From Swiss-Prot:
Its main location: mitochondrion. Monoheme cytochrome that may play a role in the adaptation of adult worms to low oxygen tension. This is Cytochrome c type-2. SUPFAM superfamilies: Cytochrome c.
Amino acid sequence: MTEIPEGDYESGKQIFKTRCLMCHVVDSDKAKSGPSLNGIFGSSAGTVKGYDYSNANKNANIVWTKETMFDYLANPKKYMPGSKMIFAGLKKVEDRADLISYIEVESSK
C-alpha cells in the first residue's frame, strides 16, 4: 500500500488553483472541461454524472481513495492509459499529499 505523508491544506489549495482549477471544481457538481471532484473519495472512476469520460476511465475499475489518487497524480497518463486527463502530473510527493489534503476537505463539504 502506498504511504502518503501528511499534506498541507493551504499548499494544496495553491496547487489546486494553479494546476487544477482551469478544468475541475471541488465545491459543486458542475463539470468544467474536466469532471467535478466533489465527493470524489469513495466513488468509482468514470461515474460523475454529466461528464463524458473516455472508455479508459469508465472501464478502469478504480475506486478513488487517497492512495489511488496519490498514485494517479504522479502520472495520470501512465496510471490510466487512454484517459482524457491532459495534466502531466505532480512529481513531488509533498505536492501530491498537499493537493489530496485540499481535495479531501473541499470535496466533502
